[in-house]
Amino acid sequence: MAKVYEFLADGFEEIEALAPVDVLRRGGVETVMVSIMGRREVVSAHGVTVVADLMIEEAGDFSDADLLLLPGGMPGSTNLRDHQGVIAALQRQAQAGKRVGAICAAPLVLAHAGLLHGRRATIYPGMDNHLGDAIY
């Protein structure tokens, strides 16, 4: 069975985090919400608290992931960008030839991790300056 890890940071956008988890789980995909906040409770950009399945410190190296997923939202995307564990996991995933995904503002995290060089990418309107040398 496929396995997806979705990283959550305070300031995430609710629909971008929860809709993919809902659809994937309904489709039989093992989907694990991972908090990077040092606690399982993660607070969205609009004050909704979600309880993650794991904290990043409990999750291992994510080598069993088929996809690492990043929801957008602010300041959630910048919180993800600034977390070295997230960046390292994304880089390992890409080096292994496995998938990474980012929604709305979160492609800025992929750019920061150096994963968008010469690749097509999209981002929330007006944030294209965060994509580095990606093809926008």
Range-by-range predicted roles:
Residues 2-12, 23-36, 53-136:
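Active-site-adjacent pocket-lining segments in enzyme domains
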Residues 12-17, 41:
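Short N-terminal binding/cap micro-motifs at the start of the first secondary-structure element
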Residues 19-21:
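Histidine-anchored nucleotide/phosphate-binding helix
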Residues 36-42:
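Short active-site-proximal "capping" loops at secondary-structure junctions
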Residues 42-43, 59:
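Active-site alpha/beta core segments
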Residues 43-53:
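A cross-family phosphate/adenosyl-ligand binding-site feature
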